[in-house]
Amino acid sequence: MLYWLTALSDGGDFFNLFRYITFRAGGAFLTALIFGFVFGKPLINVLRKRQGKGQPIRDDGPEAHLAKVGTPTMGGLLIVGALLFSTLMWARWDNPFVWLVLFVTMSFGLIGFADDYAKVSKQNTSGVSGKVRLLLGFVIAIVAALWASWNHPAELQNQLAMPVFKDVLLNLGYLYVPFCICVIVGAANAVNLTDGLDGLAIMPVMIAAGTLGIIAYAVGRVDFSEYLDVHYVPGTGEILIFTSALFGGGLGFLWYNAPPAAVFMGDTGSLALGGALGAIAISTKHELVLAIVGGLFVVEALSVIIQVLYFKRTGRRVFLMAPIHHHYEKKGWAEPTIVIRFWIISLILAMIGLATLKVR
């Protein structure tokens, strides 16, 4: 919205700053951060009052989690609210990729909100049926995948960019849209599975989003894309404003989610943020890089898949408990130890993901 202040500029005054994506990205970060600090405590008080017993805790989970009884959920409302407010304030409203990412974020956030509401209302961990959530997720992802494809340059449509390899695009043809659908749905559910410890999911999401934001800015500029020898996708630079807002809102939420958490993000936050990562990846055509920078989420999801399939086949378990962060809890690792080590892994993966821009 503030971008339109450039109309008041004569080319050399303060209003001219709003032309620059980097300036507006900084503004988006600070706006979302302040939003989180200002509205965080009041929101937690409202959630605690409305929810009473808070988020239901699984009886078969680690014993240490019983101490979390009474902690309110739906804290993702704070992140999504900060993200929406800040992005609308600082991003260009005529950019299709901004609206695409916001659409996916808000839509998956609504699915998560319905699930959280059902859990709190019924005081059980079931929530909305998994099949219903998956179906709705696929519907949203179909719209998003087609939306992204229509706004990509003709020479990039249905093309899958291969990281590291120079000028290598794999033409998936009619399989590209289904592939993008799986990326979005997979990312949303992988982040959802990761959100099981205080502070565990939000920092890796912020790291992945920050990395993808840098990539979006690079591929959205002709000069940067030529220098780095990556494909040019006009308009994706504005996504940096969204990811900056996500980073700021995430920090504001982490202030209250740090151990011991005063609030959980719930499915409201995890599905929204995971969907956002998937939407950014398909917008920038860096779907495979998402698997690198979001490698932690991939491992968490795979641990559940492996556990379920192996148990059905043999009646035994590979892990003490899945997702894998619970496996380490069962082994006696302290919750903060798991969280910080997973953060470190996320940072390493982000560096590897960024390196793919130059290693060609």
Curated annotation (Swiss-Prot):
Keywords assigned by UniProt, alphabetized: Cell cycle, Cell division, Cell inner membrane, Cell membrane, Cell shape, Cell wall biogenesis/degradation, Magnesium, Membrane, Metal-binding, Peptidoglycan synthesis, Transferase, Transmembrane, Transmembrane helix
Substrates-to-products reaction catalysed: UDP-N-acetyl-alpha-D-muramoyl-L-alanyl-gamma-D-glutamyl-meso-2,6-diaminopimeloyl-D-alanyl-D-alanine + di-trans,octa-cis-undecaprenyl phosphate = di-trans,octa-cis-undecaprenyl diphospho-N-acetyl-alpha-D-muramoyl-L-alanyl-D-glutamyl-meso-2,6-diaminopimeloyl-D-alanyl-D-alanine + UMP
GO molecular function: metal ion binding; phospho-N-acetylmuramoyl-pentapeptide-transferase activity; UDP-N-acetylmuramoyl-L-alanyl-D-glutamyl-meso-2,6-diaminopimelyl-D-alanyl-D-alanine:undecaprenyl-phosphate transferase activity
Pathway(s) where this gene product acts: Cell wall biogenesis; peptidoglycan biosynthesis
Bilayer disposition of the protein: Multi-pass membrane protein
GO biological process, one term: cell wall organization
Protein's UniProt keywords contain Transmembrane: yes
Subcellular location(s) per record: Cell inner membrane
Requisite cofactors: Mg(2+)
CDD domains: GT_MraY
Segments passing through the bilayer: 27-47, 69-89, 93-113, 134-154, 168-188, 199-219, 239-259, 262-282, 288-308, 337-357
One GO CC term, this protein: plasma membrane
Keyword Cell inner membrane tagged: yes
Role played: Catalyzes the initial step of the lipid cycle reactions in the biosynthesis of the cell wall peptidoglycan: transfers peptidoglycan precursor phospho-MurNAc-pentapeptide from UDP-MurNAc-pentapeptide onto the lipid carrier undecaprenyl phosphate, yielding undecaprenyl-pyrophosphoryl-MurNAc-pentapeptide, known as lipid I.
UniProt xrefs under NCBIfam families: mraY
Family as reported in the entry's similarity comment: Belongs to the glycosyltransferase 4 family. MraY subfamily.
Classification via HAMAP family: MraY
Name of the featured protein: Phospho-N-acetylmuramoyl-pentapeptide-transferase
Protein's organism: Ruegeria sp. (strain TM1040)
